[in-house]
Amino acid sequence: MCQPQASQRAADEQRSSHLHNAMTRSPPIQPILEEGIDRKVLATLRARFLALSAARLERAMQGLSTRQQQAVQLLPLLFHVNHPLLPGYVSASTPAGLSGFEPDTELLAEAQRLTRSFTYKPLRGRPAQPIWGLYLMGSLGTVAQEEHSDLDVWVCHDSALDARQLDELRRKCDLLTAWAASLGSEAHFFLVDPQRFVQGQRETQLTSDDCGTTQHYLLLDEFYRTAIWLGGRTPVWWLVPAYEEHRYHSYVDTLLERRFVRAEDVLDLGHLQQIPPGEFVGAGLWQLYKAIEAPYKSLFKLLLVEVYASQHPQVHCLALAFKQAVYAGQLKIEELDPYICAYRAIEQYLRDRDAPERLELARRCLYLKVNRPLSRPPRNRNKSWQRVLLEQLVRDWQWDERLLVRLDDRSRWKVRQVIQERQALANELALGYRFLSDFTRLQQAASSVSRRDLSVLGRRLFATIERKVGKVEVLNIGISPNMAEDSLTLVHGEDAAGDLCWSLFTGSLNAHEWANFAPLKRTRELIPLLAWCHRNGVIDAGTRVSLFAGDSGLSELELFNLLSELRQALPLPLPPVDAQTLLATAQPRTVLLLVNVGLDPLDQRSLLQMPEDGAHSDPLGYAAARENLVLSIDQVQLSSWNELIVSRYEGPHALPDCLRDHLQNLPADAVDGLPQLQVRCFSRNRGQAIARRVEELLLEARLQLASVHSRYLLQVRQQFHLLERRPDSVRATSLNDRTALLAHLGEAHHVYRPLRLDRHALKGDDLRLILPLARPDCLQLFYRVRGETAELSILDECNALWCQRLPCRDEQQLLMPLLRFLRSVEYRRNARVSLHGDDGEAAFDIQLYRLHGDPGEPSASVERRPLPQGGTSDACYEVQAIVEPGETRSQVTLYCNHREFSELEYGARLCIAVAEHILSQRRDGERYPCYITDLDLSGMHGSGRSQTVQLLRYKARLEAALNAALAQL
């Protein structure tokens, strides 16, 4: 127990020193509460813990600079007094007074060296001492202490402090943090209210490696086995044997009630009897999350979490083992080192599971964490105690010098070493995730938060280590600080199977040398290899690349430009991905399109045919031959999950296929948050024009296909490519010629689908004038008269196209039959439409247009014409058709001026009979064409609704059959 006087403190330290020297011969202590406990036994136990703490503090000081040592030494005094001349001063009323503490002359002398005018005045009487304890947490004093290890300080305070006092105490801690930084120490002070802590309530993180309030018991375990006592009360947990942990509270109550210990001498932070399974999930998630960026430190801790979780519910944590060793008199400080104890537990766990590869990785993690390069001589003549301890471990592991050299050279590891290590790390990350997932499911330990975190972590792991088609593998998951090579050789040639590929070699090799070396990487295409080099930092701005392009057509200038574009479009390091982003589906963030890599679509012959007037300057239909200058596209896409994916498109469909996939990756109805798009082409001839055309096309297609059911028409040479946004995909249809295009545009689809044209599509074609005029719920009739023939086109209510060529002697005779038919369609439609308009259908509107001028000339135009007055409603010879489903085929019934002609009566002679009747009704037997004036297909469709284009097609077939029969008579 801390004594109020410096002389008593010195006596404590002297006793601790004697005990430290006699650690190996300390007898075991097994107090039994019911048999009574000698206070001397409790004093001995306390002295053992204090001796270990003092020994760790001494070792911690050895690893600190003189100024850093000063910061640690003065902390008890700085929390004991408020003095304007000392660091951390806020006000005279700031809570101060470290329980049971009085500074000795050496400490006061240290304070006066800091501030000469400072004089210490002992407090008289029994003043309040609201600072109950100061403890250093973490790796200080352990084998893993580094030169820049953080100082995590727990400031345990009186639970009675009010909000104002706590605020002043926090301000004091902030000032001390700044002061420690001026001495070269990164200090973090954490206020701990013991009463709230025991109840699992805390307001802030309690270590610089703390992930929140869900790890109460694991944090307490770490505190009890790593904390270094600086002053104040000592944990009452020290005085409760491990075999009494199950009745911790009653045991402590007895110690206090029987006055074996005084309440003002001890600090109660709780016990470690049982750790809830949810804590292992939370801790495992946190360590796994950090292991993706810094694997060695975090995987070691993750393995310890796995050890604990595997013991659930009877978890014998390391703090209890540490306490057992102290009671047993096993006080050798090296064996009680927190990291060594953790390693021993991990080693036993992995040996029991026959996992030698995982054990070797755990050893490498510990070795690299300790960071004492054993293949190199020590900095000083005398070896540090960490080095001596590590040398003993390495001898036990039977590591050879070559392995030590490789590990000590990690800062200079390049591709080959990183690839070798990445496999082991990726396997361990995957194993850790599966263990956590299985443990969560078996123990039903997942809260809604941990389920969400598991999902996020799974996606983060998937984005980092999982392989998939086109994805650039990330090698350097916190393994090496710099993988850039000084020089590389890039070769295009044949592989062992005789197939062409790109190979990357280290060093600057000539044609006679590279055959004798194994490449770092091979790929079929160039861009995946360059993207891999960039993403993994293998090539940076200072790397010299020797190029042997073979027959690829790649020049050194183009290679330089490609690498520069990758660096510009995808600057490294990539920004971290937050959890909210991982909860959503991965979306493209940056898209770089590289057109015609290593290709020049214009040879000298093509250059002679360059258009002079710009009429055929479109790269998708260039010159008189309408050449397509887009021969290949390499797409490099960075997703919102930081996945880099490379896709290649080549051949005549390269552009539409790339466009389809690009649009497929965009969310439907997306306006904001579209990925940044960059298009580059380094072809010698018209490279910039090609890139500009492709970029404009993609941006236009993005805009026009932003909503569901929208369509976009692109023409490449004489081929057409129609892209359509479906609810869950983008569909691309390639059409070889205009005939195929007309057939496709004439298909029924029962929902309005707007169609937008690329600015170069259908140039010189009437469709260029017609298609942009489409409107929903309209029947739009377009006609062009060419001498004695006319071309009719109809856009129906859903924007389906129907075309027909007819003889034309008179516009009225041309239009009236078709307009009568459309009126009957309109009538049937309007008869179905609810007066309230709540059935999803709208009434039709019929519009008439005439086309003028040559479609290839600027003078071409479309004129809106009024519907002919009268005519359509005048008396005429009615030919109505009703089509119904039959057992094997549809059944047609025709009505000629209300006289019925059915297949039941006439069979195969139906059309002949109707033709004869029609002919008999005409004056002088005139043989002009007959027309269907009304058609009902409602029985053929389950919905009862026929799209107009379907009616027009069936009408044309019936009319053809009737007119053929008429011609035979």
Predicted features along the sequence, with ranges:
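Nucleotidyltransferase catalytic cores
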Residues: M1-Q112, G200-T204, L220-L969
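Flexible helix-coil linker/hinge segments at domain or subdomain boundaries
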Residues: A178-E186
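Short, conserved secondary-structure transition motifs
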Residues: S185-T207
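Conserved structured core elements
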Residues: Q69, A128, E147-H148, A163-R170, ...
